[in-house]
């Protein structure tokens, strides 16, 4: 279910303060995967936490409106069963 239009997009207040205070080229670490990407974020690099480490995400114009968490996957695909060492 999508967020109501009357509420507007969500972004953590602390994250927005970090973005305005950040210098160019600085990686902004965040645990807020639920925050919406705003146009003010374009050209900045965020370190988005995936539960284990911070994944660097460079924000481009196409990403505006999406959530930060969409670009830092939390699960690693190990692949389907291989036939390693199995001989016919």
UniProtKB/Swiss-Prot annotation:
It comes from the Bacteria. The keyword Ribonucleoprotein applies. Keywords: Ribonucleoprotein, Ribosomal protein, RNA-binding, rRNA-binding. PROSITE patterns: RIBOSOMAL_S19. GO terms for biological process: ribosomal small subunit assembly; translation. InterPro entries: Ribosomal_uS19 (IPR002222), Ribosomal_uS19_bac-type (IPR005732), Ribosomal_uS19_CS (IPR020934), Ribosomal_uS19_SF (IPR023575). One of its GO terms (molecular function) is rRNA binding. The keyword RNA-binding applies. Belongs to the universal ribosomal protein uS19 family. Protein S19 forms a complex with S13 that binds strongly to the 16S ribosomal RNA. This is Small ribosomal subunit protein uS19. The gene is rpsS.
């Amino acid at each position: 279910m999508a967020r109501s239009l009357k509420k507007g997009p969500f972004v953590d207040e602390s994250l927005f303060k970090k973005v305005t205070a950040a210098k160019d080229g600085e990686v902004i670490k965040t645990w807020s995967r639920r925050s919406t990407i705003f146009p003010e974020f374009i050209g900045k690099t965020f370190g988005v936490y995936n539960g284990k480490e911070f994944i660097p995400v460079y924000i481009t114009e196409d990403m505006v409106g999406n959530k930060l968490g969409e670009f830092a996957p939390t699960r690693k695909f190990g692949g389907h069963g291989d036939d390693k060492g199995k001989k016919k």
